[in-house]
């Protein structure tokens, strides 16, 4: 009986994850016992399990932090925020996938299984409290990401992207584990994060050369997951070759999970080397902001452009991680990440819809879309403007708060480069918007001329447009109500 109560006590800390596991089991059972006509049940179960997980997480929001499973998992306010963000990403991505899966005749069950399992791995990663659990959760997320990126097996580009993703992902995980091994040895054989810190203090190794090796190795491993320059080589190919709903999912969840990991590892274990990891992240953020935005200008593929744009966006988020020592630092990072989820997924919703109706991803082929589908063109324009940071959209207020916190924390170089690169990003976003709104027949390509006109431009007719409406509304209005969001983040964290 005592063991049963202990199981209930510890299991309560991962109740949202348990709901996802139950949803996965139900998906498998229904797939084995029913025919293909019951496909709506697959989406219903997936969405229901995600929504229930969010609900349980919100109900447990005010509970005291707790370490369970012999120190393997920590339920803290910080982990709850990032687990919520991952669940939110996953919930918004499923409606994006419904029409795509139907049109491309992809296997539904496996797709949803991999997506939910990746979300599960990301949630466990956000609360993992020891080096082994971190690695297992990270690999759970990564392996599902590899499988999702290569889901269209008959597509040569998808196979090529998956192979690059798998090889480079495996190499980065090896480097990350190499850094963990240094921490394990220097701390005297500890794996729990706080015990690693205590072990480094007891062995007087917190300022040794080995710590610098561990720091660099872990930064390289996490930099790959965040698509930081120069560990970004996989990103454009995976974005271009993978199914668009998969790219939408990976573009946000991987950054949320890796940001949570980076924040906990650097701020806790490398507390005594704060100057070193601040400098290292500053260099990576500057490179990402500059190269990401400059190379994005030259792209002709919409998804490749967003791949390079995402490198610049994660550079902005790094400012919040570096400024995380202050009360506003983490709050600014979380606030901008919330805005980025809606801005990015809204953009991808428009790309999925356009791709299904035209079969192209070339930026030039978007010319004149406003004449055929004003709703999609207007939605894409708003999301791109928000990504660029145009007032009064959410992206502007998120970046403004992020840069202000970075300036307050003394990251003057980062904050000087950030707005400049943001202005450059506005250039290539506006170039796309100009194409969208053109009415010159000479510029309109056959793809748009043959575009299947919607019966009504401003009424949602499918799940993609429903997701689009949610994301566009959030991208335009959340900046106006940013103060309550910041207050919730600060109150939760501190």
Swiss-Prot record:
| Catalytically driven reaction(s) | a plastoquinone + NADH + (n+1) H(+)(in) = a plastoquinol + NAD(+) + n H(+)(out); a plastoquinone + NADPH + (n+1) H(+)(in) = a plastoquinol + NADP(+) + n H(+)(out)
Question: How does this chain assemble?
Answer: NDH is composed of at least 16 different subunits, 5 of which are encoded in the nucleus.
The species this protein belongs to is: Cycas taitungensis
Alphabetized GO MF terms: NADH dehydrogenase (ubiquinone) activity; quinone binding
Q: Which compartments is it annotated to reside in?
A: Plastid, Chloroplast thylakoid membrane
User: Which family does the UniProt entry place this protein in?
Assistant: Belongs to the complex I subunit 2 family.
Could you confirm whether the keyword Transmembrane appears in this record?
Answer: yes
Q: Record's Pfam families?
A: Ndh2_N, Proton_antipo_M
- Tell me its EC number(s), please: 7.1.1.-
Instruction: Spell out the protein name for this chain.
Output: NAD(P)H-quinone oxidoreductase subunit 2 A, chloroplastic
Where are the bilayer-spanning segments? Answer: 6-26, 39-59, 81-101, 106-126, 131-151, 166-186, 211-231, 277-297, 305-325, 336-356, 377-397, 413-433, 468-488
Q: How is this protein situated with respect to the membrane?
A: Multi-pass membrane protein
Q: Provide one Gene Ontology cellular component.
A: chloroplast thylakoid membrane
From which lineage does this chain's organism come?
Eukaryota, Viridiplantae, Streptophyta, Embryophyta, Tracheophyta
BP term (GO), one: photosynthesis, light reaction
Q: What role does it play?
A: NDH shuttles electrons from NAD(P)H:plastoquinone, via FMN and iron-sulfur (Fe-S) centers, to quinones in the photosynthetic chain and possibly in a chloroplast respiratory chain. The immediate electron acceptor for the enzyme in this species is believed to be plastoquinone. Couples the redox reaction to proton translocation, and thus conserves the redox energy in a proton gradient.
């Amino acid at each position: 009986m005592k063991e049963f109560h202990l199981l209930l006590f510890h299991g309560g800390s991962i109740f949202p994850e348990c709901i996802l596991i139950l949803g996965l089991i139900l998906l498998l059972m229904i797939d084995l016992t029913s025919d293909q006509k019951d496909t709506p049940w697959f989406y219903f179960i997936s969405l229901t399990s995600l929504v229930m997980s969010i609900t349980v997480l919100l109900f447990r929001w005010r509970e005291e932090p707790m370490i369970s499973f012999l120190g393997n998992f920590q339920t803290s306010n910080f982990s709850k925020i990032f687990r919520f963000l991952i669940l939110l990403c996953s919930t918004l991505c499923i409606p994006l996938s419904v029409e795509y899966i139907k049109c491309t005749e992809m296997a539904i069950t496996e797709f949803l299984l991999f997506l939910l399992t990746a979300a599960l791995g990301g949630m466990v990663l956000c609360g993992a409290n020891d080096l082994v659990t971190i690695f297992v959760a990270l690999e759970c997320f990564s392996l599902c990401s590899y499988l999702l990126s290569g889901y269209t097996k008959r597509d040569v580009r998808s196979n090529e992207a998956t192979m690059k993703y798998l090889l480079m992902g495996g190499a980065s995980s090896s480097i990350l584990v190499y850094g963990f091994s240094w921490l394990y040895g220097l701390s005297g054989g500890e794996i729990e994060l706080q015990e690693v810190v205590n072990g480094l203090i007891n062995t007087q190794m917190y300022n040794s050369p080995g710590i610098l090796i561990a720091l660099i190795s872990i930064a390289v491993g996490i930099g790959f997951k965040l698509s930081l320059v120069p560990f970004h080589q996989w990103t454009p190919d995976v974005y271009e070759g993978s199914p668009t709903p998969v790219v939408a999912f990976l573009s946000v969840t991987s950054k949320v999970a890796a940001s949570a990991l980076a924040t906990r590892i650097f701020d806790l274990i490398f507390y005594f080397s704060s100057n070193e990891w601040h400098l290292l992240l500053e260099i990576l953020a500057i490179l990402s902001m500059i190269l990401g935005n400059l190379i994005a200008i030259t792209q002709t593929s919409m998804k490749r452009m967003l791949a390079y744009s995402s490198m610049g966006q994660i550079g902005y988020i790094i400012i919040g991680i570096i400024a995380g020592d202050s009360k506003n630092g983490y709050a600014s990072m979380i606030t901008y990440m919330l805005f980025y989820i809606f801005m990015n997924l809204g953009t991808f919703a428009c790309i999925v819809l356009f791709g299904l109706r035209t079969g192209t991803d070339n930026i030039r082929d978007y010319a004149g879309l406003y004449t055929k589908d004003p709703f999609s063109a207007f939605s894409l324009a708003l999301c791109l403007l928000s990504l660029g940071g145009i007032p009064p959209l959410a992206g502007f207020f998120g970046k403004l708060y992020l840069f202000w916190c970075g300036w307050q924390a003394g990251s003057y170089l980062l904050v000087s480069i950030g707005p400049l690169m943001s202005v450059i990003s506005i250039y290539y976003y506006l170039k796309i918007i100009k194409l969208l709104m053109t009415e010159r027949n000479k510029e309109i390509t056959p793809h748009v001329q043959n575009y299947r006109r919607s019966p009504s431009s401003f009424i949602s007719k499918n799940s993609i447009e429903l997701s689009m409406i949610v994301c566009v509304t959030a991208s335009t209005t959340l900046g106006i109500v940013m103060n309550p969001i910041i207050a919730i983040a600060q109150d939760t964290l501190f």
